[in-house]
């Protein structure tokens, strides 16, 4: 019985005994005995604990002792803690303090931002703050909260005369004694108040009387002044009227004489003007016919010269490939508006050079451009008819030969007319000038006939075309040498190889962006003659938008109106000066970073999880080599920074970091600015191309309005992205992207997520039903992508957000002030309307855009 009672007693009261043995006694510290810097009740005293604990465990332990992890530490307290840690912390180099990002961004546990908040990367999750011992610098770090470290607790102080209740270290100041003043009786107050009011009333009455008297005096003065002024006006008016009558009588006779003289002069002048206008009208009529023929001739010659020069450059020049259609367009405009306009016009106007002025020059050029536009439309319609008709191979060959014959006939006629004009320009006779005019008209008519036969080649045979070409040559030869037979058209190719044509074309290509025309909508026909083939007519118009980024450059479009940004990272070790020259050689400059969007974009370019991730940093254009302040290489100001802790120091050049830097005393060094010696070699360089000034003429990767990114730098894994701001359900979002020959976007890795973050970022926070659709869908049992890609290479889901729905959105900013929901995936109902759609598609191949085709996933019903 005794044993049973003892057993029951032990079973019932053992938990109480264990609790009593393990109960932690509250730590009591007296004011000033431990912490000489104690100025507040929070940090009245502190104690370092050498037992390593995780961040949460250390926080709970301090609370159990009646204190907290060291909170709101200033620089002086930090130094004191670090110095004591050298004495009390044996087996570790750092200790926990009471700050972390468990709630959101790095902040003190009891609220308030940290003074050195730029030290930590905001995207790092589950990090606490730890401080080094003084012997190794006393620096601050962000450390994963699961790591076990010593820690420091702070407590409210207790008085030396402490009783059962704790007393704060700092007492409130005692109130000063105020001597008691006797209150006056109510009767005395009323009497004094009435007396004051009566005095005030009397003063007001006196002031109003004085004001009335002064106003009356002022009115009397004004009346007397007005009377005096009216008398003066009457006197002056009477004097003026008498003078006017006398002067009018004297001038009447002289006016009559002057009128008769002026009428005679006007009659003579009108007669002379009418005579001169009659003479000028006759001259202008002849000049108008002359100008029309000359314009037609110049157009033919310019077209032929460009065709020959294109053929010559294609066959002989090693640098021909670098010239694009825009180059030839600019060259054509320069040739028609420069060489031909000046040389041929001056040759034909030797007898009347006075009319060759800038106004005629511009009018003629505009007429030429209008004619070129009409011919371009004719050739396009002819080309459509030819493509729709089912001609045989023999007919195609016939068209090809007739086209070549027509072109050669035009060339021969033009050059014969030119040589004839040069031989006749030495004579100033009217008869020679009219003969030259007839010759040009005949040559122009022959050339027009040849071109007409070319445009109607689908209804005429080869013999007729050859005959018309021979007729054109015969007309020219008969005027020059009546007894000479026409030359073989094939031999006319080399007759126009003149140095002035070469110089003109080279000058036009060298200055390809400064055209001589003023017409912004210039359309020029450039015909390239190839053996045994139809002439290729290229109708090139000046682009109204900025050119797209060069091939394989990351292209970033923020919206439809802002210009695109073009960046590319080159894995080439070099110092800052070599990096600067390298980017200049690529047609751009070292990259500039001016806002959070660009920071996100470039962090995607530098994102690296490979073995060399710790040394992943690159040169950017920020430097102070030539001045005392920082400025970018493109001469833009430093208006946005994310410096590393302790930076900038004494170095003049800047790198942009990728992942954490090795051998750096702080954590949280991702995607920051760091000042480094300019002569130090960095592993890569980040270049930026300014649109419209790039020298790279490779084919673009994405169409206008799309942004390009490749997580590994290869076109194989590259994608073109575009955000479309239309409120749609998911099924409607599919159709929106399909119209753009794309799919609802796939975001498969951390690099793409960072890049897309910059695209979907907004100026304000939205709810979960106001986000951006992406193409991650739960089709049957598993998730997949609309474009057929499979899998995820990172964990994109938002914490404490649903994942069981079938469709997915990508968040821009925070949802309901949840900082962990920024730039993450959220599972949502497919039938809910979202704010925008993100589309993606493969990049262009050889300049050809991607064409939409259904995948196994995109064809499934949701």
UniProtKB/Swiss-Prot annotation:
The keyword Glycoprotein applies. It comes from the Eukaryota. InterPro entries: C-type_lectin-like (IPR001304), C-type_lectin-like/link_sf (IPR016186), C-type_lectin/snaclec_domain (IPR050111), CTDL_fold (IPR016187). GO terms for cellular component: extracellular region. Glycans are attached at residues 22, 91, 222, 258, 279, 352, 559, 765, 831, 857. Residues 1-20 form the signal peptide. This is C-type lectin domain-containing protein 161. The lineage of its organism: Eukaryota, Metazoa, Ecdysozoa, Nematoda, Chromadorea.
